[in-house]
UniProtKB/Swiss-Prot annotation:
The lineage of its organism: Archaea, Thermoproteota, Thermoprotei, Sulfolobales, Sulfolobaceae. Belongs to the eukaryotic ribosomal protein eS6 family. GO terms for molecular function: structural constituent of ribosome. It comes from the Archaea. Transmembrane segments: none annotated. HAMAP family: Ribosomal_eS6. It comes from Sulfolobus acidocaldarius (strain ATCC 33909 / DSM 639 / JCM 8929 / NBRC 15157 / NCIMB 11770). This is Small ribosomal subunit protein eS6. GO terms for biological process: translation. The gene is rps6e. Keywords: Ribonucleoprotein, Ribosomal protein. One of its GO terms (cellular component) is ribonucleoprotein complex. InterPro entries: Ribosomal_eS6, Ribosomal_eS6_arc. Pfam families: Ribosomal_S6e.
Amino acid sequence: MPDFKIVVSDPKTKEDKKEKLKVKVSDKVKSNQGEKEGKAIPLARINDKIKQALNLDDFLTLEITKQEGDKKVKIKGHFKIEVDNTVPDGEVWISKSMAEKFGAEEFEALAYRTRAFQLSLDQSKLPNLVGTKIGDVIDINVSGVNLKLKITGGSDNSGFSMRFDVGGGAKRKILVSGPPGYYPKEDGLRRKRTVRGNMITPEIVQINTIMIR
């Protein structure tokens, strides 16, 4: 049974405030098993001043650019923040395992409010997700972090998109005039496309959601 890839977007993140921060490993930040692979949500500690300056709510993204051969590669990590006013101004503390993802225990990173992140979760640990539909609100707990999410769409293991206006979880071939499943080059064009219904089934591999507060 494949993992569910759950894409979580924050609709309240509009304009990013960005700041360079010094990132350090701290024993005070616990590692969550699977956080490097996206199977758990890593933690980061910052002080309240940084939280306010970056207009953060619950999540922080750290981004660096590394030179690999003849090309530059961006590495990003998305963290659930914990406010700790013993953290010096201009710093963020992370776990050792997440530092390994970035390739250093101390480095500078661009920090900003998270727009979206992806989790890869075992289907067997989310039995209540199967049978839910686009528009439903679900509560999940990932490594101690509670998330309230609204399902907005998804796709199956063949890449067919779920549609809110098609009932059930089976594949169907229907006439469509717009996304998901079809992107017309001109207004008014319609085509028959295979799509998935609006219900989550074990064949769904990606689930798109937004955070609810």
